Regions:
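Glycine/proline-enriched, intrinsically flexible loops and inter-domain linkers
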Residues: 1-194
Length: 194
């Protein structure tokens, strides 16, 4: 029951809240990737090397994660101790951000992430393991204590077809294995299926 100024403005039956939506039964499939693609030819001259370098630096596995990271509130109400972005223009991403949830206290909270879209496209399990390993490395790089880590997953799986659900299952397996290997719990997450 939600009340405002002594008046009931919302009343949601708990049975409906917890059991009102029928559960869907979805089935996923997964098959191992056919393996690595062919290696590219060695660039024949300086111009071809420059082009290859430009393409590598633009690749999502290498390029700046700034467009992704700018989408969430990394400053958290002005309690930032170590900003996620640095450099003269404030656009160079760092390994992680550190916030002080209680001003004046000698401790903080580290916020880090990891991502490898190419590896995840071959196998969501190893993409998930890589993402967790990168996030953990980024956390430690700014002084985070690996024994005090709480993990958070964010899954966005917009197409609930069998192949996508199989990949989702592999990603969840990776989360479970990372949790078991590190001894660190998943404390929260957001999972979106269409």
């Amino acid at each position: 029951v939600v009340r405002h100024a002594g008046e009931t403005v919302g009343d949601l039956d708990m049975h409906f809240l917890h059991e009102g939506l029928p559960e869907r039964v979805l089935t996923g499939t997964w098959a191992p990737s056919p393996g690595p693609r062919e290696l590219p030819e060695v660039p024949p001259d300086a111009a071809a090397w420059a082009d290859a370098l430009t393409r590598v630096l633009a690749h999502p596995n290498v390029a700046s994660k700034e467009p992704i990271v700018r989408q969430y509130d990394h400053s958290v109400q002005g309690t930032i101790v170590l900003p996620l972005f640095g450099g003269p223009a404030g656009r160079a991403p760092g390994d992680a951000a550190v916030i002080a949830p209680l001003l004046g206290k000698p401790y903080g909270v580290v916020i880090a992430h990891g991502l490898n879209p190419v590896l995840a496209s071959f196998d969501a399990y190893w993409g998930g393991v890589w993402a967790a390993a990168e996030a953990l490395a980024n956390l430690v790089a700014v002084g985070g204590n690996p024994r005090e880590i709480g993990l958070i997953d964010n899954f966005i799986w917009p197409v609930p077809d069998a192949e996508s659900l199989g990949a989702l299952d592999r990603a969840v397996e990776a989360c479970v294995d990372v949790m078991r290997a590190t001894g660190r719990p998943f404390i929260s997450g957001k999972d979106s299926l269409s």
